[in-house]
Structure formats: C-alpha cells, structure tokens
Amino acid sequence: MLGGSAGRLKMSSSGTLSNYYVDSLIGHEGDEVFAARFGPPGPGAQGRPAGVADGPAATAAEFASCSFAPRSAVFSASWSAVPSQPPAAAAMSGLYHPYVPPPPLAASASEPGRYVRSWMEPLPGFPGGAGGGGGGGGGGPGRGPSPGPSGPANGRHYGIKPETRAAPAPATAASTTSSSSTSLSSSSKRTECSVARESQGSSGPEFSCNSFLQEKAAAATGGTGPGAGIGAATGTGGSSEPSACSDHPIPGCSLKEEEKQHSQPQQQQLDPNNPAANWIHARSTRKKRCPYTKYQTLELEKEFLFNMYLTRDRRYEVARILNLTERQVKIWFQNRRMKMKKMSKEKCPKGD
C-alpha cells in the first residue's frame, strides 16, 4: 500500500497529472460514495501523455479546478419527528387544531373509486363528513363530500356546519368504504340536480308555503260544504307541522283566514257557464262614494254661503285649495243647491 502510493506520488512529481494523484489523496475507503456524489470522471480527467502539461501554469490550473474537499451535507440524513401537537397548543386544544398533513397521492391513486381531497373539503374525522360520525353506520349517504383515504379523527373541518348527524358508531374499514361509495353517489346526484335546476332557471320561489297550498288544493278538490276548508286546515294540524304562513298567532288573522276559507267554497261552487246563477253575485260597476273630509266640507259650506254660484275661475281656485277636482266642486255645489231648494220647500208649504 505504501509502495503503491509512493509510486503514484513519484509519477505525479514527474509531471504526469492524472486521476492517480487524486485517488491517492482521497483514499480507497470512499470510492463508492464519491463516485455516487460526483459522478464518473469526465473526458478531461483521463490520463494525458507526458510532456503535455509540464509547465507550472498548467499544474496550477489543474489544482485550482480539482477541489475535492469533503463538504458537510446541508440537511442531515435523519429528520427529527415533528410533534403532532405543540406543547403550547396542548393546553388549549379547544381553540387550536393541530396541522394534519394530507395523505400521500399513491394511496389515493391505488383506489380508483376515490379522488384526491381538496383543501376545502372536511376530513373524515369531522362529523359533517361522510366518513366520520355522519357516515359511521355505513348505510345512510353522507351530507358532506366524499373524503379521501382515512385520516386522523381530530382533523380540521374548515368551519363547515355539520348537517343531519347520525348516531356515532365505530367506523371500520368496510363501513368507511361503503359510506364513501354511497356519499360519492349522493354527491353526484346532488350535483346533477343542481345543474338541472340552474338550467331550468327560476321556476318559482324556493321557500313557499307548501302546507298552505296543499290545504287549498284539498279544499278545492274535495270541499263541497262551507266547512270543508276548515276541516282540511284543522284536520292535519295535529300530525303535520304548522303552516309556514301562520307565523303570527294573532286571533284577528285566524278569523280572517276562516272567513276566506268559508267564502272560497261558495265561490268555487258557482258555475261560470250559468249566467242565471252569476247575476246574483255580480259586482256593481258603479264607483263608490268618496265622502269629503270635514275640512273640505267646512270650506265648501263657507264658499256656498258667500256665493251660491261659482265662476269657472273661482271653481278651479277652490278645487286647488281643497285638493279636489273641478268636477267634484261643481257637483258639490249642484247638490248643495238642490238640498237648499228642498229645505225651502219644506219650510214654506203651498197652502201658505
């Protein structure tokens, strides 16, 4: 060994610079390590004939380019295990949730029925998810999106509100698989329904008084007597939920609803093709009387006492002051003159 290294040093001192000199400096115990780190020697490192690099400048250039000092690795080979829950957060476990790394992609790719969970979806440990408390039984479809591979029980839920929660049961591998498959089908059905609803457009109010509409339909089809509407409304009140329209329990409102339900069957019994039955219930087209207010009546009486007949200009002025039309003022003065004439006849009979 010593003789070989001495021979190599002698060859290098004679001017032949090759990989023998580097080999003697490094040693034989780390050939495999350095070969893996630096790779095989390039074409420039092959042995060159003597006399090519005899000058001191070439020797200095060779030594400057070959700096094989062993360096310490930037990252150590063994990483220290990160604690699942820091000591500061251990005291306040109700406020801070530990970070849970996502599952590896290889595990999700091995199962074709699942997909990679996004960061917005809850982890299976959360009760709202299908693989947690909500889908632990494995029978009912979960409300949340389908989880990925099984994760820890105390995962983040990202503030998603838990929906209908089933009874908690020990989740096994078979139940998790079945619940994930059922949640996949339910989520796909919900997606199809939402897409169909969006394509149809706004077909009506989403939150309507279904119970009230059902009662009206039942009264319209089967109600023949005056109390059919009330029977339909009160008969189902004990078993079903109360109507969403009757949010205000005021006695006046209930009486009005009963009166409406009384009048509805009578109107529905009328035959639209029978004019003999409809003329009794016909509405008059005559305009209703619009009485004047006390202030308007007082001002008109003052004007009548001052002058029984008004000119057109004065009539327009009075109508503008009292917020009336010119026609109303003219008709009132006509009626007032007829009333005065009638009163004068009563006071002075013909015999006198």
Curated annotation (Swiss-Prot):
SMART domains: HOX. Residues 197-208 have a biased composition (Polar residues). It is found in: Nucleus. Pfam families: Homeodomain (PF00046), Hox9_act (PF04617). GO terms for cellular component: chromatin; nucleolus; nucleoplasm; nucleus. Its main location: nucleus. This is Homeobox protein Hox-D9. One of its GO terms (biological process) is hindlimb morphogenesis. The keyword Nucleus applies. InterPro entries: Abd-B_homeobox_TF (IPR050803), HD (IPR001356), HD_metazoa (IPR020479), Homeobox_CS (IPR017970), Homeodomain-like_sf (IPR009057), Hox9_activation_N (IPR006711). Signal peptide: none annotated. The modification Phosphoserine is found at S146. SUPFAM superfamilies: Homeodomain-like. The keyword Secreted does not apply. Sequence-specific transcription factor which is part of a developmental regulatory system that provides cells with specific positional identities on the anterior-posterior axis. One of its GO terms (molecular function) is sequence-specific double-stranded DNA binding. Residues 126-208, 229-276 are annotated as: Disordered. It comes from the Eukaryota.
